[in-house]
């Protein structure tokens, strides 16, 4: 109480620590001279031109693997809406709102991206819930792009990582992410990150291309149990194990959610 007599004694701010690890991945390619001579194509040039896309898929796979592990942590059970355990296993018009409110409560507006299977996207289209926002990308040539949104959230449609099982038994996972869900930092101090080598002896000549990338890709609000990681870089399996993560901050600070559902008759 600011009554002119009571001391305003500072209170120390307390908190916890997050532990993360650098994830390092590598890939090498090779092509025989014979292949180039036979086809007239240059496979190594093609590979070099596509290496950014290759690693883009690598990191996408790592991120989704971490997300599914984190959302299986018991302390984050409210962040998962599993419709497959109920009588109505399909999504409805209000499913998104139920999921984000259960996960973040009064901070539910913090989830702005949905990653879903094409079958689930189809169900939302049948409910006429899909809108499209137009954006102008400035560059050498101005280009207008259109991005889908559902309930004000941007949508990424991919059949990778978003379904298990098949047919009527298929379970679809729709992920919701908010800004700051992951902490990320690239490793930029590699020596010889991309290296070429030519072996003139083997198979009458082989071109080799060695690559490696490293990145911190950490779920914000949790800590990775580094004592459970066998080597200096965690494996895909280690990052995908929910027991290797522990909650460090309030659950509302974890900007992730998950909806598990099947495909049925959409209800509005």
For every predicted segment, state its role.
Residues 34-106, 243-245, 252, 261, ...:
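Alpha-helical scaffold segments that mediate packing/assembly in large oligomeric complexes
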Residues 24-27, 50, 207-209:
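Oligomerization/assembly interface segments of phage tail-like spikes and tubes
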Residues 1, 60-64, 215-223:
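Intrinsically disordered or highly flexible coil/loop and linker segments, enriched in small
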Residues 51, 118-120, 213:
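Short, flexible loop/turn elements at secondary-structure junctions
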